[in-house]
Amino acid sequence: GKESKLKKHLKKVDILILNHGIYNLSREYSNYENSIQINALSKFKFLNLFEDIALKNESPTKKEIWINTSEAEILPALNPSYEISKSLIGKLVSFKKNFLDTDSQKKFIIKKIILGPFKSELNPIGIMSPKFVSKKIYDLANSRNYLIIISPNPLTYLIFPVKEFFNF
């Protein structure tokens, strides 16, 4: 809830990358609330804040925000609170991107990063290595594509673009 306190620091940033939040297997109500707040609503606040900074920016350099959502937008996850929160931020990012007008698109770029299961502290059973995933993100980052998809699941590459096409 204190995202706006970072505004003066974010003005110096050209590319803001929002990655993971929390992954808690507890089925208590407070866990669902925390997951939605941290994994979705906080990221959406940062998205809106950074957009505001970008649109007021006088520099010729476009500001970019890259937001890691998840395959949980289209596929079930082992953790319901994670699935709900990641699906929500995915929908909010799509909503925001689809409603950027032409002038805003000249100053502000939104990229959605969709990662399949990679090995991390949050996911010790992930099948992709962090090194592989980071290299693929780096390789795809300079493309003009809105979606940066890295997954061992071929359905993700098929379903995500179709889903995005029909959003809003």
Regions found by a protein language model. Name each.
Residues 38-61:
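Amphipathic alpha-helical dimer-interface segment in Rossmann-like NAD(P)H-dependent oxidoreductases
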Residues 112, 118-167:
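C-terminal helical subdomain
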Residues 56-102, 119-120:
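Catalytic loop of short-chain dehydrogenase/reductase
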